[in-house]
Amino acid sequence: MQMENKKFDWSHTVSAPENYPMRIYRGELKGLTDKDYSATFGLWGVANEGWGRISGAVVVGPDTKAIPDSLLITWLSFRENKFYTGKFQLPREKIIALFEQGFYDYSIEKKNTYKKIVVGLAPGGVVVVWLLGGQVEIEVARFQAHETIISNVNVRDSNYDMFEEDYVDFVLTNKGIEKTPVPFGLWDTYREKYAWRPKLILPSGYDFFLEWMTLYNGEKENNFKEHPDFGTYKKRALPSYMLFNWYAPDDRKYGVDVFFDEKEIFDAFQQ
């Protein structure tokens, strides 16, 4: 089967940084041809679960679908009270290759693959696309949208409430979000990569077997002892969270959660 005709089981969803809510006005993951499935972003509501974290998901259309060719999106950034828009060509061959390659999912002890295409929206018109499956999430693209003004809104429009007076203030107040300065550029800083590895030092007889990491750029890794990247240096974004698991000599399993201070870890690596 030719690459452009290959189909996979996937759904689509949205992500936005915590305290920086976004809402899509119009959006579509457009198929390569008119015959291919195109996934639309309809009445999604406000997203701000955290960078890389998903805001629901839409499971519609056929069970398997061709990978989309492009992303068309227009959205409202509440903290800026601005609309952004853009049309972007997706790295389709790269996405297909990752879907085919998949990964070993330790949580189910077998090979798994990606199930969601996640579109991330951040202040300043930042657009990031990830693939998510199981406990693994990987960035595949970063785009730049531009500001736009939406006029001639029809009261019958399903998103008409976005244009009502005081709507932006209502959402920010309802979510308890203060109007502090927006740190433009932060989400590109999160994407900077450094060569590092996680390492857990244990006494003799203890067996370290699993590490699970959430990175500041929204990616997630799930490495186990037999994984080729386990314990090796690799260029990756900095971690916000890690989970380590190990066995004691009595075969009891232990684990520890590690939460990193953002300022401290970035200062340490940027020095």
Predicted regions and their residues:
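Compositionally biased low-complexity segments at domain edges in trafficked proteins
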Residues: 98-187, 271
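Sec-type signal peptide cleavage vicinity
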Residues: 1-43, 64-65, 70, 191-216
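Short, exposed coil/turn segments at beta-strand boundaries within extracellular/luminal domains
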Residues: 79-83
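Long, compositionally biased intrinsically disordered regions
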Residues: 175-189, 198-205, 231-234
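Short beta-strand elements
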Residues: 84-109, 113, 118, 255-270
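Tryptophan-paired
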Residues: 30-77, 208-267
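A structural detector for beta-sheet-dominated domains
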Residues: 13-17, 25, 30, 76, ...
